Every structure is written in structure tokens, then in C-alpha cells.
Amino acid sequence: MTVTVWKYPKRDEWKVIMARPQMDLISLSRTVSDILESVRCEGDDALRRYEKQFDRVVLDALQVTPAEMEEGVAAVPESLKKAIRQAIDNIRKFHASQAIEVKKVETSPGVWCWQKPVGIEKVGLYVPGGTAPLFSTVLMLAVPARLAGCHEIVMCTPPGKEGKIAPAILYAARETGVDRIFKLGGVQAIGAMAFGTESVPQVYKIFGPGNRYVMAAKQQVSVQGVAIDMPAGPSEVMIVADSGADVRFLAADFLSQAEHGADSQSILLTTDRRIADLFPAEIERQLDRLPRREWVEKSLSHSSVVLLEREADLADFVNAYAPEHLIVHRADAEEWASAIVNAGSVFLGYYTPESAGDYASGTNHTLPTGGYAKSYSGVNLDSFTRKITFQQISSEGLKNLGPVIEEMAEAERLEAHKEAVTVRLQSIHS
């Protein structure tokens, strides 16, 4: 498999290099909307029908039972349980540090304002199964949801052919405090959480990655009264390397991203010709050892190495692309990264692989893709909260601020707004 190498491209060629694999959500729209409408109208009957059609499983009960939970938990090796608990601890520490103390501010004498974060009452988590059951996604979503104070955490994940959920997903859900787990995948799972059925409760916000059908479903329900975490597309990584970078590390990071899916994208940026020349051969060497080679090769078909002429161009290229993941293989990684303003999550130094953030460093792996890192943050504690503002004004405060409000209301010709202040001021002065 040959990775495309761009040598000293001009700036007007950057757009071509940065082109991402596109999901044609428009062509999926009718199929997705039909499934969503069926779930809205038919409830559990539609869910069972689509599970039989798409996941090839006949389900009596949609919700995971206590007995199924215990059976699944017992099947998880102790070594994996220990690793999951350590990851939970790190994720909890990092997200707990994001909590903000409520602070009252006196904006003018007698006028107090403050803001209070409140957990979203009902949230839905979508955890992909398919080619790789992503139990790590349970940790990334359920830990901050519980920290934020969400009252009900509902999770949907597709069952295997025997109608069972992957044991590691069940263990992760139990350890993070997920309230209810449903054996549902795809568009039908998103519809169930968005609209509610006889078995599945309706939620207020849906989180989690998925294939293009899941992404299209999330976008459709987001204009029907249900919030979603962010728009999302294929996963991606950009790697920046200096002359001191180890080409083995670079190739390993490049391939770990390609392993996410056939439409994932990896881009290596460097100004060092030796790195650019050695890299393709190292990719081939490591690729031969991967069991998912055929899957990874599809991703590599739209990945590339970019050899730039000037150091100053590196940060410009990164900020223009706005990668989901940015790995900085540089001796001056932290200093260099101070110029980065568009990225989902940044991994600094030679010994910080992206997989650390995917699993256990503590940061969240649910991140904006497709250039959305220019305008969206990754999932964090705030993602699971709403901020309610409060204000309280004393009689003296209204004396001070009232004339300002009256003047502005009169200028906007909103007499009732002005009168709401005037009647109070008259009461104070009488």
C-alpha cells in the first residue's frame, strides 16, 4: 500500500491535500427519516423489526436484564477490569477538575448576578458495536454525565448475533453508573432515545459516535427538539514531526488512526526530508503485522505525507485543517503548540500516543471532526450541563439601575418593559 507523498506543495494546493472523505448524508436522508418515523409511530414493534433486519437478531426484551449484566461482568478478565477502573479514575479526575464554583457578582450597587450549572436530567449515550465494541466510549460519556449530575443515563448499543452485549461494555456501564442499557443499534437506537417508546425513555440530549447512518439520524433528530453533542464525521489525525522524531512512532500513530475505519484520515506533516522518505517503508513494515490490514488499507488510500518547506507553514497548515487529533512529535512540542488554535485534542511530545487519549489519560475522546474543531469543543463536563443565570435586585439596586432600564425600554418603544420598572420605583418612592 503506497501512501501519497506531497513534496513542497504550494499553498494553493493545500486545499486538495486537506480534502476529507465525505459522507453523503443527503442520499441517506430518506432512508434515515423513514426509520425514524417508524420508530416514532410504532415504538417497540419498529425497534424489534429493525433489529431483526439490520443486526440479524430477534429480541424479546430490549433492555439488558440484571442476570445478563452479571453474566457479562463475570466474563470480563480481571486484567481488563483493572485497566478499565484505572481509566475511569483518570477520566473522573480530569473532568471533575472542570467544575466551576458558583460566583455571585455585584454588577452595580444592589444588583447581583450569578450562574449555576445544572446537569441535563435525561441523557442518551450511543456506544458503537460492529467491528469493534467500543467500551471506552462508555467511559468517556458516562463518567462526565454522572459528574455533571444527570438524573437518568440511558445507553443504547447494538447486540451481537446471539442477542447479547459485549461483556466489556456491560462492565464499563456498571462501573460508571449507567442506569438503563438497551440492545439497540443504528438509526433505530437514535430514534428510540429521541422520541421514546414503550420501553426506551425519551432523553433530552444524545451523545456518541457511530457510522454515517447514526450520524445522519443524530442530525435529523437535532432539529426535532433533541440536542446532540456535535456534528461528526470520519475520524482523523494530523501528526507534526521534527527531525528528532522516531519514524516507528510516527507510523504506529498513523496506523492507529487508520484502524478506526475505512473512511478515517491520517496526515503526517514535516519539514524533514529524511522523515518523509523513510516513512512509507515503515508504514508497509508495520502494516504487515496488523490483523485488520484490509480495513486499514482503505483508510490509507486517502491519507498522506506532506513535506513542507518552511517551519512557519506547519502551524498554518494545522490550523487550516483543524484536526480532530493532533500529535506533535517535536522536542519543543508544548512551545510549538502554543500557535495552534484549531484542534480537538493535542498530544504533546514523542511519548504521547493518540491511543492514550482514546483510552486512559483522562481527556475525552469524543471530539469534533470534519473541520468542526474550528467552532466546537470536544465532549467535556459542560456538555452534560445547562447554565442557568440568576439575578436579584434590592430596592436600592433598582433605584440605581431603574432609570437605565427605563431609558433603554423607551428607546426601543417597549412601554410595558418600562412600566415594569416604573411601577416599582413609584412604590419605593411612595
Predicted region positions:
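N-terminal Rossmann-like NAD(P)+-binding subdomain of aldehyde/semialdehyde dehydrogenases
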Residues: M1-E121
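C-terminal core of ALDH-fold dehydrogenases
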Residues: N319-S430
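Conserved NAD(P)+-binding/catalytic subdomain of aldehyde/semialdehyde dehydrogenases
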Residues: E175-Q265
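General beta-strand structural signal in soluble alpha/beta enzymes
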Residues: K103-T107, L125, M155-T157, R180-G186, ...
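A glycine- and small/hydrophobic-rich beta-loop-beta segment
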Residues: S256, H260, L268-A343
